[in-house]
Curated annotation (Swiss-Prot):
Binding annotation for Ca(2+) 1: D519, L520, D521, D664, L665
Subunit structure: Homodimer; disulfide-linked.
Residues that, per the record, bind Cu(2+): H510, H512, H675
2',4',5'-topaquinone: residues carrying this PTM: Y461
EC number: 1.4.3.22
One GO CC annotation: plasma membrane
Enzyme class: oxidoreductase
Signal peptide: 1-19
Tissue expression profile of the protein: Widely expressed with higher expression in placenta and kidney.
Record protein name field: Diamine oxidase [copper-containing]
Reaction it catalyzes: histamine + O2 + H2O = imidazole-4-acetaldehyde + H2O2 + NH4(+); N(tau)-methylhistamine + O2 + H2O = 1-methylimidazole-4-acetaldehyde + H2O2 + NH4(+); putrescine + O2 + H2O = 4-aminobutanal + H2O2 + NH4(+); cadaverine + O2 + H2O = 5-aminopentanal + H2O2 + NH4(+)
């Protein structure tokens, strides 16, 4: 790395000089968490390019032997400084960017990160390290568009001997293919040891849903050199057998020694051919078949007669009792920050850390696949949301900018949406019967929630990320999985690792795991962790001493140390996970928020097993740690391609076994599910049953249900004469788009 002569003292002086006076409005204060604007991204880009000693080249240059800026995103200031700015009115923390540079044009290629600031007019940079003494290896870098282009060229050249083989067995080719081209899916980790960059590629026919069209051929390519001329195919797998090279496969094919599978033509009418005589591809989304009760009209949709009931200013949201900021981090995804309810902070940060999918299979690519999606730009693949499908048409859509494997900021329109919606179930209700065929009163509060949503399409899979805010102080984080399954070529042996989904297709067994960081600040930063469980007691009946009573009692456990509060998957996780404040509610209970996890996850890899080092967080459905600035993330963009020597090892967060009583606490939550693909996953996995997440629920935090402040409540009182009295606090709408006027009878009588 070229020598950089910026002094630390000069940086500190600049940080102090650029600090701003305390802002007075919420939107301006929320800006401390906001993603970099298009102008800020360009300013960082220009500043880095002005440093001639970096010898930067465009990302689009088709070579690995270059220095290029791969990623620019906002670098979150230290929590201590942010809280003093938010709560004490002190100076605005200096605004900085994180820049990741691939240094391939030097004797020892590496990846180096820098903090660049102050923004909006940067004038310094300093090196960053994921942990002291760690240097990200060249092989650990995420794959780039330029590398993909070189890989495709390598495949074209290496598979020339297989041209006739491809035409005869698939009808597609890498050579002069026009609308009948072959494509590939690369899997990771890329090798079997740190420092390797050897990828198995699944060769597929490039048609709609090509993920489901493997040809039976998989290739192992070594692409570790910065000189793509040295890249080579090391092994070949075809229909259950290994070959040493494409030439060997071509030779044995010509000699009739290969067990060939000739695939049916997926495009009998040609690409794009729209014929009513030909059924659509099984991987297509085109409708086919009929319901017993056909539906030929559009369904219900939301309306907002008076516009949105939330306020959105910049990256700040206000909704009923809620206020929070948000950002869409290019590397790892959606974060909500500075979350308040009723004017009190509940959480400083709730964020997605990583999403993994760990597979099994009979083919080499199937058994090698362990996807760690932050290594594929989990937060940057946030493509446009469709109104009326991905979000209600009433949603407010938000654009974002990402600088990820590009030469300029890339504009992603409608990457996020924010909307209020009815849940379809009351938040609460009660029918108070008079047990005489009538009622004393009916009271109900309609279920309404605010949803902040984005999606990540990581190649074949689509993740839908939601943060949901309820009017009673409950916050929910949820992930829905959909998209195409990761599939390999059918062999009879493959049925041990998945399900046959089509003639030549196996849907491979896999487990989805998602890791969240939940920095709870329950009425302050001094919190403790405890659990409540139900325990049965068997006692003498006090009013009938000859009999006994079995009844539940409360069993409370206080956790003093991090190791005590790290729950392994094989250990029973208590149902009530409580983060308490020293403060008490009016009834003498600690003001508390409960973490409630909804997950079907289990441990997938044995502890200490090779690649498991990159996902040691996956040992724990819950681990509670003391806040440390050195423990802000549980994964990184480097874990995918070097899981054997990752920069962040979550297990090390627990080694110091710090005290967690009356401390600033962080909950690390793992959720997920086992997915055994089935025929109904064609063409795409559906969202019902494939969602996981957790809730943060007030537990003695308030003196009563805070949703009593909602004016959506409706109470109905019976009258002896005339219509019942309906008590409302928001006038009933008479808009043409609204449902019929509300009415309620409440009687139940014999007929």
């Amino acid at each position: 790395m070229p020598a950089l002569g910026w002094a630390v003292a000069a940086i500190l002086m600049l940080q102090t000089a650029m600090a701003e006076p305390s802002p007075g409005t919420l939107p301006r204060k929320a800006g401390v968490f906001s993603d970099l604007s298009n102008q800020e991204l360009k300013a960082v880009h220009s500043f880095l390019w002005s440093k001639k000693e970096l010898r930067l080249q465009p990302s689009s240059t088709t070579t690995m032997a270059k220095n290029t800026v791969f990623l620019i995103e906002m670098l979150l200031p230290k929590k201590y400084h942010v809280l003093r700015f938010l709560d004490k009115g002190e100076r605005h923390p200096v605004r900085e960017a994180r820049a990741v540079i691939f240094f391939g044009d030097q004797e020892h290629p590496n990846v180096t990160e820098f903090a660049v600031g102050p923004l909006p007019g940067p004038c310094y940079m300093r090196a960053l390290s994921p942990r002291p003494g760690y240097q990200s290896s060249w092989a650990s870098r995420p794959i780039s568009t330029a590398e993909y282009a070189l890989l495709y060229h390598t495949l074209q050249e290496a598979t020339k001997p297989l041209h006739q083989f491809f035409l005869n067995t698939t009808g597609f080719s890498f050579q002069d293919c026009h609308d009948r081209c072959l494509a590939f899916t690369d899997v990771a980790p890329r090798g079997v040891a740190s420092g390797q960059r050897r990828s198995w590629l699944i060769i597929q026919r490039y048609v709609e849903g090509y993920f489901l069209h493997p040809t039976g051929l998989e290739l192992l390519v070594d692409h570790g050199s910065t000189d793509a001329g040295h890249w080579a195919v090391e092994q070949v797998w075809y229909n259950g057998k290994f070959y040493g090279s494409p030439e060997e496969l071509a030779r044995k094919y010509a000699d009739g020694e290969v067990d060939v599978v000739v695939l049916e033509d997926p495009l009998p009418g040609g690409k794009g051919h729209d014929s009513t005589e030909e059924p659509p591809l099984f991987s297509s989304h085109k409708p086919r078949g009929d319901f017993p009760s056909p539906i030929h009209v559009s369904g219900p949709r939301l309306v907002q007669p008076h516009g949105p009931r939330f306020r959105l200013e910049g990256n700040a949201v206000l909704y009923g009792g809620w206020s929070f900021a948000f950002r869409l981090r290019s590397s790892s995804g959606l974060q909500v920050l500075n979350v308040h309810f009723g004017g009190e902070r509940i959480a400083y940060e709730v964020s997605v850390q990583e999403a993994v999918a760990l597979y099994g299979g009979h083919t080499p690519a199937g058994m090698q696949t362990k996807y760690l999606d932050v290594g594929w730009g989990l937060g940057s693949v946030t493509h446009e949301l469709a109104p009326g499908i991905d979000c209600p048409e009433t949603a407010t859509f938000l654009d974002t900018f990402h600088y990820y494997d590009a030469d300029d900021p890339v504009h992603y329109p409608r990457a996020l949406c924010l909307f209020e919606m009815p849940t379809g179930v009351p938040l609460r209700r009660h029918f108070n019967s008079n047990f005489k065929g009538g009622f004393n009163f009916y009271a109900g509060l309609k279920g309404q929630v605010l949803v902040l949503r984005t999606t990540s399409t990581v190649y074949n899979y689509d993740y839908i990320w939601d943060f949901i805010f309820y009017p009673n102080g409950v916050m929910e984080a949820k992930m829905h999985a959909t998209g195409y399954v990761h599939a390999t070529f059918y062999t009879p042996e493959g049925l041990r690792h998945g399900t046959r989904l089509h003639t030549h297709l196996i849907g491979n067994i896999h487990t989805h795991l998602v890791h969240y960081r939940v920095d709870l600040d329950v009425a302050g930063t001094k919190n403790s962790f405890q659990t409540l469980q139900m325990k049965l007691e068997n006692i003498t009946n006090p009013w009938s001493p000859r009999h006994r009573v079995v009844q539940p009692t409360l069993e409370q456990t206080q956790y003093s140390w991090e190791r005590q509060a790290a729950f392994r998957f094989k250990r029973k996780l208590p149902k009530y996970l409580l983060f308490t404040s020293p403060q008490e509610n009016p009834w003498g209970h600690k003001r508390t928020y409960r973490l409630q996890i909804h997950s079907m996850a289990d441990q997938v890899l044995p502890p200490g097993w090779q690649e498991e080092q990159a996902i040691t967080w996956a040992r724990y459905p819950l681990a509670v740690t003391k806040y440390r600035e050195s423990e802000l993330c549980s994964s990184s963009i480097y874990h995918q391609n070097d899981p054997w020597h990752p920069p962040v090892v979550f297990e090390q967060f627990l080694h110091n076994n710090e005290n967690i009583e009356n401390e600033d606490l962080v909950a690390w939550v793992t959720v997920g599910f086992l997915h055994i693909p089935h025929s109904e996953d064609i063409p795409n996995t559906a969202t019902p049953g494939n969602s996981v997440g957790f809730l943060l629920r007030p537990f003695n935090f308030f003196p009563e249900d805070p949703s009593l402040a909602s004016r959506d409540t409706v109470i109905v009182w019976p009258r002896d004469n005339g219509p019942n009295y309906v008590q409302r606090w928001i006038p009933e709408d008479r808009d043409c788009s609204m449902p019929p006027p509300f009415s309620y009878n409440g009687t139940y009588r014999p007929v």
